Amino acid sequence: TAAMALSFGATSASADCGEVSITEMDWASSAVVTAVANFLMTQGYGCDVQVVPSSTVPALTSLAETGKPDLLTEVWANSTPSYEPLRAEGKLVELTNVLSDGGVEAWWIPAYLAESNPELTTWDGIMANPSAVGGKFHDCPSGWACDIINNNNLKAAGAEAGGLERFQHGSGETLQTSIAAAYADQAPWFGYY
């Protein structure tokens, strides 16, 4: 789930807002959410906003250890095991889902591929014919929480031995571009998003 979370010690919104630290995670949608939050807080509440470049794991670690930053503008809560304990301990409060449906992280194939090859909707089907998905798993960039999770799951499932290469993208943008290019060409694609 993509959520906006407020740390326990965060300054409340008021006419005398003061200093507030907010994250800008290292993916495109977070940059938009951060820009909107920054604008509203500075223009609407007179806050002195400090934007902190980060990503999920470092931001949550900092929050757990220091109570900062005050606002995590976009967190994919299902990709990090520390989110729920921090929420349960009262160290963060979830304000809202940033994306209308909350966001879904998963392993995907394009609908056109599933329709023409329904067997590819299962792991066993993919491993029976990895070339049908292009012979590779498009993975998230290093530093994202999904990097470790996906790598461990692929190793445990024997992906490489079964003929499926893990291709780790250098950024969220190149991962998105690979999806868009596959759709434009109706080409095989399998990976995380």
Indicate where each model-derived feature is located.
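Structural recognition of the beta-strand scaffold that forms the well-ordered cores
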Residues: 21, 50, 70-74, 105-108, ...
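Pocket-flanking alpha-helical
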Residues: 34, 52-91, 174, 178-182
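Ligand-binding pocket segment of bilobal, Venus flytrap-like solute-binding proteins
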Residues: 61-62, 69-73, 145-193
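Solvent-exposed loop/turn segments at secondary-structure junctions
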Residues: 27-30, 58, 77-81, 113-115, ...
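Short, well-ordered beta-strand elements
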Residues: 16-29, 47-52, 134-138
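A conserved helix-loop-strand patch within extracytoplasmic ligand-binding domains
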Residues: 91-142
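Ligand-binding cleft/hinge of the Venus flytrap
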Residues: 37-45, 130-165
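Gram-negative bacterial Sec-dependent N-terminal signal peptides
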Residues: 1-14
